[in-house]
Every structure is written in structure tokens, then in C-alpha cells.
């Protein structure tokens, strides 16, 4: 797969070629998680509507829910004004967090 050159030209990546993905639940508006993407992960996400991310620790792409069954069906992808973050709007099946929680932001409230 190859990311559309017009989209690729707008992206601002870090030194590792990655950019941030913020994931929001379509129905509730809850922020579910933040992850990393590379061009190929974004391209796969756009073409399949399966949320695909890049794992820095494993050095590879991963499709959300491929092993856990906690999938994300992508309804929209938006690029922010700086080009360094995308916002995915998804239908979440199961927990979005690796802990099994619905969102990665269910923990301690700081303020």
C-alpha cells in the first residue's frame, strides 16, 4: 500500500517517521486512546477502515483488535492544522485500552 502523495506531503513526522493519532469514539465523543502511526499505517487505515497503528516498542504495525477482538471501525480521519496529528473517529468494540478499560483515560483525574 502507498499513501496518497497529497496526504503524505501534508504530514509532519518525528525523527522516526511517526506522527500522533488521537482516537475518539463516534457516539460518545470520548477520547479513547493516543497512538503512533506511520505512513503505511495511515494508508491501511484509510483503505480498510480498520484502525492500524505503529508500535514503537515492537517496531511494527498493528491492527487494533487483531488479537484481542477489541476492534475499531474507522468512520473518519482528520488531519490537524499543523499536520502532525490525525484524529480518528471510530466505533469501538470492547476496551480501547490495553488494560481492558473502555478508554485509556479512565485512570486518575488530575484536575
Curated annotation (Swiss-Prot):
Query: Which organism does this record belong to?
Result: Mycobacterium marinum (strain ATCC BAA-535 / M)
InterPro entries found in the cross-reference section: PRA-CH, PRib_AMP_CycHydrolase_dom, PRib_AMP_CycHydrolase_sf
Function field: Catalyzes the hydrolysis of the adenine ring of phosphoribosyl-AMP.
Q: Which family does it belong to?
A: Belongs to the PRA-CH family.
Annotated PANTHER family: HISTIDINE BIOSYNTHESIS BIFUNCTIONAL PROTEIN (PTHR42945), PHOSPHORIBOSYL-AMP CYCLOHYDROLASE (PTHR42945:SF11)
Q: Residues that bind Zn(2+), according to the entry?
A: 81, 97, 104
Subunit note: Homodimer.
Keywords from the UniProt entry: Amino-acid biosynthesis, Cytoplasm, Histidine biosynthesis, Hydrolase, Magnesium, Metal-binding, Zinc
Give the protein name, as stated in the record.
Phosphoribosyl-AMP cyclohydrolase
- Catalytic activity annotation: 1-(5-phospho-beta-D-ribosyl)-5'-AMP + H2O = 1-(5-phospho-beta-D-ribosyl)-5-[(5-phospho-beta-D-ribosylamino)methylideneamino]imidazole-4-carboxamide
> Which gene underlies this protein?
hisI
Q: In Gene Ontology terms, what is one molecular function of this protein?
A: phosphoribosyl-AMP cyclohydrolase activity
Amino acid at each position: 500500500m502507498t499513501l496518497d502523495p497529497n496526504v503524505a506531503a501534508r504530514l509532519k513526522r518525528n525523527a522516526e517517521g511517526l506522527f500522533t493519532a488521537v482516537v475518539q469514539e463516534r457516539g460518545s465523543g470520548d477520547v479513547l486512546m493516543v497512538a503512533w502511526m506511520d505512513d503505511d499505517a495511515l494508508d491501511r487505515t484509510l483503505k480498510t477502515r480498520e484502525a492500524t497503528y505503529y508500535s514503537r516498542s515492537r517496531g511494527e504495525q498493528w491492527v487494533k483488535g487483531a488479537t484481542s477482538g477489541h476492534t475499531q471501525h474507522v468512520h473518519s480521519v482528520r488531519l490537524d492544522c499543523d499536520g502532525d496529528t490525525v484524529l480518528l473517529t471510530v466505533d469501538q468494540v470492547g476496551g480501547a485500552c490495553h488494560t481492558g478499560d473502555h478508554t485509556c483515560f479512565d485512570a486518575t483525574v488530575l484536575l
